[in-house]
Amino acid sequence: MSKIPPVNVKDLLDAGVHFGHKTSRWNPKMAPYIYGERDEVHIIDLRQTAALMNVALNAIYETVKNDGKVLFVSTKIQASDIIAEYAEKCGQYYVNHRWLGGMLTNWKTISGSIEKLNKLEQTLENEEACIGYTKKEILDMNRKKDKLLLSLAGIRELHSKPDLIVIIDTNKEHIAISEAVRLDIPIVAVVDTNSNPDHIDYPIPGNDDAIRSIRFYCSLFADAALQGLEESMKASGVDLGSIQEHGDKNLAPKNVSKLKQAKKFSKTKNINEEANTEFEQALSDADEDKN
């Protein structure tokens, strides 16, 4: 059983997770997750966010605990560095610059590009090998290497398809979602009020634009993965010392059976009265502070 502490509404509110988009930009499919509107901006129901976040975190935990691989995806500017930082922190994988078509469905081609990147690095790091090239040729090789690194740095040790994908901004990452659905890979995703929650196995209603919110999500995702990694290593009889010191992507080398999809989580309504009161009081306090 996961030891992940439950996410509370107050922390979500402090991170600005409740702010959706302008009401004119909404996706009607997000209606079940919307609490109301203020100043023509939709307010997300953080009671549902908290419940669904806990479900998503457990999915990440269980995946890594069972030696599965998690791929974090967000190529939007404000999330790019954050995604890479936290994926590396928990020894997982990421795409944060540009999703190349076929990254999942045409892995053979992607593997070829990774091999090309590895060879370029080996050549450029070998002074003797570089002697046979002109300065222009070396400059061209460096440019090719840098371009490949932007797209492949976070998946060069992945070797095969991931067992779970975590996405921030489903609109921008629609190609990644399509490929994951095609391969039956479960998806965890933050869904804003302008998002389409269809095909998302573990939806998390929330602001997918604010840096503070994105960092909050990623810290939770990474902590869940680290706990899963710790349990996995303990089960293997390894003394980790401090799990925070591990960032080696080889710690999760095995493929495991994918988690069963749980699309019915989007219909979660079992939220206790305490959470209701907490959310409404927090919004009231926020209004008072604003005034």
UniProtKB/Swiss-Prot annotation:
Disulfide cysteine pairs (residue numbers): none
Region of interest (Disordered), residue spans: 270-291
Superkingdom assignment: Bacteria
Pfam assignment, any one: Ribosomal_S2
Gene3D superfamilies: Glucose-6-phosphate isomerase like protein, domain 1, Helix hairpin bin
GO biological process, one term: translation
A GO term for molecular function: structural constituent of ribosome
InterPro entries named among the record's database cross-references: Ribosomal_uS2, Ribosomal_uS2_bac/mit/plastid, Ribosomal_uS2_CS, Ribosomal_uS2_flav_dom_sf
GO cellular component: cytosolic small ribosomal subunit
Keywords: Ribonucleoprotein, Ribosomal protein
HAMAP family associated with the record: Ribosomal_uS2_B
The family this protein is said to belong to: Belongs to the universal ribosomal protein uS2 family.
Name under which the protein is recorded: Small ribosomal subunit protein uS2
Native species: Rickettsia bellii (strain OSU 85-389)
Gene that this polypeptide is encoded by: rpsB
